[in-house]
């Protein structure tokens, strides 16, 4: 089961144009977001370490997204 709250995930799908969404679809998107988010976070941590910092900044996340 995904750790992300399901209601906001459902809103993301609705904002994309869906009228109805199954619970399985919400769970699947939540799982995918978590997996992708964790990979981006790992890249951002490495970028922060490379810059000599322990703190991950927004710029690290942005660079991780661009390099993905």
Curated annotation (Swiss-Prot):
- List the residue ranges of the region (Interaction with DNA): 20-22, 54-57
What the record says about family reads: Belongs to the archaeal histone HMF family.
InterPro entries assigned to the protein according to its UniProt record, in alphabetical order: Archaeal_histone_HMF, CBFA_NFYB_domain, Histone-fold, HmfB-like
Q: Which CDD domains match?
A: HFD_archaea_histone-like (cd22909)
Any one Gene Ontology cellular component term annotated for this protein: cytoplasm
So what does this one do? Binds and compact DNA (95 to 150 base pairs) to form nucleosome-like structures that contain positive DNA supercoils. Increases the resistance of DNA to thermal denaturation (in vitro).
- The site (Interaction with DNA) lies at 14
Q: Which PANTHER family match?
A: ARCHAEAL HISTONE A (PTHR47828:SF1)
Under the subunit heading, UniProt states:
Homodimer or heterodimer with another histone. Dimers then assemble into higher oligomers, with the DNA wrapped around the protein core.
* Subcellular localization: Cytoplasm; Chromosome
Keyword Zinc listed? The answer is: no
Q: Which NCBIfam families match?
A: archaea_histone
Q: Which GO terms describe its molecular function?
A: DNA binding; protein heterodimerization activity
* Keywords, ordered alphabetically: Chromosome, Cytoplasm, DNA-binding
| Protein name from the UniProt record | Archaeal histone A2
The source organism is Methanobacterium formicicum
């Amino acid at each position: 089961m995904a750790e992300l709250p399901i209601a906001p995930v459902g809103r993301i799908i609705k904002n994309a144009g869906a009228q109805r969404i199954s619970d399985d679809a919400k769970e699947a998107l939540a799982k995918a977001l978590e997996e992708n988010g964790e990979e981006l976070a790992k890249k951002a941590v490495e970028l922060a370490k490379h810059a000599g910092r322990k703190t991950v900044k927004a710029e690290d996340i942005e660079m991780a997204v661009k390099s993905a």
